């Protein structure tokens, strides 16, 4: 089969935003205008096409990032037909993992902001993730029809809060109830969408006279931004010559692709205005797969390799999401970076070094699927029937193995114990949790060795609620949930030298003998977490036993002497010891090392670390006193506030242990008018009274 759409006409984009900026509605409109769905799905009647898990429709929030293919030839049919693969990403901070994961496989992003709320906490998290993966982006200021909508305020916030060089491509005509349409600053024409056909058609009109001066000012700003893309355009600009529409677009595209500027569009997805022009901007200013750098990877011989976006290179793809589908089982979403693969082909999972066979390949449209015979460079599709592929694994040609960059996933910060309600649920629960953990790398399952309980850990209360909810719905497992537990850590504050550990057992027959002397010292947080330095001189401990010493200590790190929590940020220097020709063994040295470690740890001023969250609360001004008072009771350090007439933003650092149930408390303090977001910030030493209580509770 030949390629149907040239790769230069592909756009792989993500749509991401704060939880209520109207992102799913925006995506729905994209599907409507590109002719994929004939009836617009509204989020508030639970019919949105992209939100296809039952829970999403109930809660009105997007949980799983669905990938959808759409086609667009421009509002005036001015482009050849482009293929847009849209990845809808969740906006709730408990699901940042989904956002991070989709950023990894996108080429460009549309950031949706609410014209009233502006740049909200989650927008900043998403922005940082887009920076991390150098994703070019444009902004869409949505909800221009809402009371309090202010386009230029949001443009200003993109500059001040996100550090983005925001350049408006359009200005809104009117706002709130009077929002009529937008002015295209390149064409200097007003765009008026036809309400009778839900904005499918439009007319260009003259700019309202009272807006002309403002439009000219912002157009000059736009043209200057375009001119700065090259010396040639700069010369033309300064000599007073008009830049052509083509030159302006070319200049803006160059700078947008280098992430030097963020072009800003606006509209109201709900009122069917603006999304159409934003789609044109996606094609004009966001990259095709061929516009971005080749993806880097590691060859089998550990040298660096790369793959270009071309059908002629060997096949390489990255699995970025595993979803369980009620009809076909596991769906593995993957992005093809190079080459071609047909359904039925055998490929290599280079991360696990296992062969996999592509059973069927489907192109997803929200939760409808179309079976296809092959996929090519630039495509995003889902495979059915892969056996052992996890998120972040590479699938590649058998004869050209490469491991593409791995994704890094955050450590969970909150855990709860779950127990099945009946014996019959027991087995199903293990299966369900295993399946869910495979889908979501930020969710972990383990069994507590002492209590035998099953512990699940995740990124926040909502995250775990949804996991338990999915267990009930999709796997029909009823479970009881324990109280949330905080993931504490242990570390040391002072260095101790020359601590010895000796394991000697001589009781007839072959004995056991291992003897080590170590120093223990603290490491900086954010570093490697653990280091082992071997400074044994003159063979006082034979080389073959050194790894056993390291291993003995590492096993102790899993469950620290203070309260059984993982130990972090310390180094061990092994510098002396002794051995016995007959009685020494790896096991003896492992045991000696663990004895030395425990003794040294207890002398090194051990402390308990607790996770601190970065919390941002947005509240109407009337409730600020109550909110801050409540945060102080939760041991918060309030680091600042910003206010406008509608809302006060309070930034604080709060121990996670104090944040349980906060959503409910905040609702009752502010009659449901405040919202908050939190994300893990760091670990910090717990105050003595808190640490003592935690240690005491663990002894029971």
From Swiss-Prot:
It is found in: Cytoplasm. InterPro entries: EFG_II, EFG_III, EFG_III/V, EFG_IV, EFG_V, EFG_V-like, EFTu-like_2, G_TR_CS. HAMAP family: EF_G_EF_2_B (MF_00054_B). GTP binds at residues 17-24, 88-92, 142-145. It comes from the Bacteria. SUPFAM superfamilies: EF-G C-terminal domain-like, P-loop containing nucleoside triphosphate hydrolases, Ribosomal protein S5 domain 2-like, Translation proteins. Keywords: Cytoplasm, Elongation factor, GTP-binding, Nucleotide-binding, Protein biosynthesis. One of its GO terms (cellular component) is cytoplasm. Pfam families: EFG_C, EFG_III, EFG_IV, GTP_EFTU, GTP_EFTU_D2. This is Elongation factor G. The gene is fusA. PROSITE patterns: G_TR_1, G_TR_2. Belongs to the TRAFAC class translation factor GTPase superfamily. Classic translation factor GTPase family. EF-G/EF-2 subfamily. One of its GO terms (biological process) is ribosome disassembly. CDD domains: EF-G, EFG_III, EFG_mtEFG1_IV, EFG_mtEFG_C, EFG_mtEFG_II. Residues 8-290 form the tr-type G domain. GO terms for molecular function: GTP binding; GTPase activity; guanosine tetraphosphate binding; translation elongation factor activity. The keyword Chaperone does not apply. Catalyzes the GTP-dependent ribosomal translocation step during translation elongation. During this step, the ribosome changes from the pre-translocational (PRE) to the post-translocational (POST) state as the newly formed A-site-bound peptidyl-tRNA and P-site-bound deacylated tRNA move to the P and E sites, respectively. Catalyzes the coordinated movement of the two tRNA molecules, the mRNA and conformational changes in the ribosome.
């Amino acid at each position: 089969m030949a390629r149907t759409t040239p790769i230069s006409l592909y756009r792989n984009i993500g749509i991401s935003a704060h939880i209520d900026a109207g992102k799913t509605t925006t995506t729905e409109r994209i599907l409507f205008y590109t002719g994929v769905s004939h009836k617009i799905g509204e989020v508030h009647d639970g019919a949105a096409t992209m939100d296809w898990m039952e829970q999403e429709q109930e809660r009105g929030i997007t949980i799983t990032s669905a990938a959808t293919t759409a086609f667009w030839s421009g509002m005036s049919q001015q482009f050849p037909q482009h293929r847009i693969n849209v990845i809808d990403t969740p906006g709730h901070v408990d699901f940042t993992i989904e956002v991070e994961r989709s950023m990894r496989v996108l080429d460009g992003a549309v950031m949706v902001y609410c014209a009233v709320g502006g740049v909200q906490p989650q927008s900043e998290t998403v922005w940082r993730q887009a920076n991390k993966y150098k994703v070019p982006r444009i902004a869409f200021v949505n909800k221009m029809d809402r009371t309090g909508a202010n386009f230029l305020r949001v443009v200003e916030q993109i500059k001040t809060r996100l550090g983005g060089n925001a350049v408006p491509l359009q200005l809104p005509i009117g706002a709130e109830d009077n929002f009529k349409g937008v002015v295209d600053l390149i064409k200097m024409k007003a765009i008026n969408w036809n309400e009778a056909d839900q904005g499918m058609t439009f007319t260009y009109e003259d700019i309202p006279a009272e807006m002309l001066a403002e439009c000219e000012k912002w157009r000059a700003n736009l043209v200057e931004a375009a001119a700065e893309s090259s010396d040639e355009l700069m010369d033309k600009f300064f000599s007073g010559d008009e830049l052509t529409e083509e030159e302006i677009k070319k200049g803006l595209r160059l700078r947008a692709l280098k992430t030097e500027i963020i072009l800003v569009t606006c509209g109201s997805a709900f009122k069917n205005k603006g999304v159409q022009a934003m789609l044109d901007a996606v094609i004009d200013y966001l990259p095709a797969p061929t516009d971005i750098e080749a993806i880097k990877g590691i060859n089998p011989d550990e040298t660096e390799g790369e793959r270009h976006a071309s059908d002629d290179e060997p096949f390489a793809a990255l699995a970025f999401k595993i979803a369980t589908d009620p009809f076909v089982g596991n769906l593995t979403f993957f992005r093809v970076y190079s080459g071609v693969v047909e359904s039925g082909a055998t490929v290599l999972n280079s991360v696990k070094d296992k062969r996999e066979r592509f059973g069927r390949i489907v192109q997803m449209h929200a939760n409808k699927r179309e079976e296809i015979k092959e996929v090519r460079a630039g495509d995003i599709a889902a495979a059915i029937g892969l056996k052992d592929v996890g998120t972040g694994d590479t699938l590649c040609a058998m004869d050209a193995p490469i491991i593409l960059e791995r994704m890094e996933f955050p450590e969970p910060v909150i855990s709860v114990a779950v127990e099945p309600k009946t014996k019959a649920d027991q087995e199903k629960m293990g299966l369900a949790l295993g399946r869910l953990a495979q889908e979501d790398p930020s969710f972990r399952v383990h069994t507590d060795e002492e209590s035998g309980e099953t512990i699940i850990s995740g990124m926040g209360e909502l995250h775990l609620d949804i996991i338990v909810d999915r267990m009930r719905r999709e796997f029909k497992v009823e479970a009881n949930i324990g109280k949330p537990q905080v993931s504490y850590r242990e570390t040391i504050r002072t260095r101790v030298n020359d601590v010895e550990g000796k394991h000697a057992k001589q009781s007839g027959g072959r004995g056991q003998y291992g003897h080590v002397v170590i120093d223990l010292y603290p490491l900086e947080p954010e570093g490697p977490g653990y280091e082992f330095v071997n400074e044994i001189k003159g063979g006082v401990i034979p080389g073959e036993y050194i790894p056993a010493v390291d291993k003995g200590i590492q096993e102790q790190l899993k469950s620290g002497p203070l309260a059984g929590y993982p130990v972090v940020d310390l180094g061990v220097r092994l510098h002396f010891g002794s051995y016995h020709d007959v009685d020494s063994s790896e096991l003896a040295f492992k045991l000696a090392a663990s004895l030395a470690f425990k003794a040294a740890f207890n002398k090194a001023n051990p402390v308990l670390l607790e996770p601190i969250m970065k919390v941002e609360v947005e509240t109407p001004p009337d409730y600020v006193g109550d909110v801050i008072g409540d945060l102080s009771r939760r041991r918060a350090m309030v680091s600042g506030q910003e206010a406008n007439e509608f809302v006060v933003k309070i930034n604080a650092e709060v121990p996670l242990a104090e944040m349980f149930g906060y959503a409910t408390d905040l609702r009752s303090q502010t009659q449901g008018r405040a919202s908050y977001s939190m994300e893990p910030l760091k670990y910090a030493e717990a105050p003595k009274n808190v640490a003592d209580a935690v240690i005491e509770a663990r002894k029971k």
